[in-house]
């Protein structure tokens, strides 16, 4: 991508961002990102999170999904969040800053979880996009594979998993792996996802040990 193209692309993104209905609505409701509406839509359709549950939120910053999750689990529940980027504190959310790809960070996250299994694993992780599918897609697939591996380590029987996946090379194989691990897997494209984005969300329920 040339500097001129990149500049035009960035300008278009900024214009879309500021004109975006969901961005304005998020600001009005005090939500940290428009992504919060994606989780709200998934919750409305699939009822993933219930009061008293323990939820792990991967790729949490700036905190839109954690804000939604902590309200849903209530005082008796727990939300454990992780991101490579910093995140301002949210009451009721135990946040760990670090690169989830590193063993030390994974181990620290597992320590936060403790011996209790979790009910829901959420992943809105995405790599820094370079604009090259040949680079971006493998990076994105690596992250979602790590998220599925996290499910295998911490998820309770019949637990649930919601993960952002970019359609492209490796998607079908990943879908197969998720289907092998869960009883029911649905593909969702929330209304709040940008139409031109290749992102979809896999909502998997009924974790099979």
Swiss-Prot record:
Binding residue positions for S-adenosyl-L-methionine: 63, 65, 83, 99, 124
S-adenosyl-L-methionine is among the record's keywords: yes
Transmembrane intervals: none
Gene3D superfamilies associated with the record: Vaccinia Virus protein VP39
CDD domains for the chain: AdoMet_MTases (cd02440)
Keyword annotations of the record: Cytoplasm, Methyltransferase, rRNA processing, S-adenosyl-L-methionine, Transferase
Residues annotated as the enzyme's active site: 164 (proton acceptor)
A Pfam family reported for this protein in Swiss-Prot or TrEMBL: FtsJ
Enzyme class name: transferase
Subcellular location as annotated: Cytoplasm
Ubl conjugation is among the record's keywords: no
InterPro entries found in the cross-reference section: RNA_methyltr_RlmE, RNA_MeTrfase_FtsJ_dom, rRNA-MeTfrase_E, SAM-dependent_MTases_sf
Reaction(s) catalysed by this chain's protein: uridine(2552) in 23S rRNA + S-adenosyl-L-methionine = 2'-O-methyluridine(2552) in 23S rRNA + S-adenosyl-L-homocysteine + H(+)
GO cellular component terms listed in the entry, alphabetical order: cytoplasm
GO MF annotation terms: rRNA (uridine-2'-O-)-methyltransferase activity
Its EC number(s): 2.1.1.166
Function: Specifically methylates the uridine in position 2552 of 23S rRNA at the 2'-O position of the ribose in the fully assembled 50S ribosomal subunit.
Family stated for the protein in its record: Belongs to the class I-like SAM-binding methyltransferase superfamily. RNA methyltransferase RlmE family.
HAMAP family membership: RNA_methyltr_E
Entry protein name: Ribosomal RNA large subunit methyltransferase E
Natural source organism: Shewanella amazonensis (strain ATCC BAA-1098 / SB2B)
Gene name in the database record: rlmE
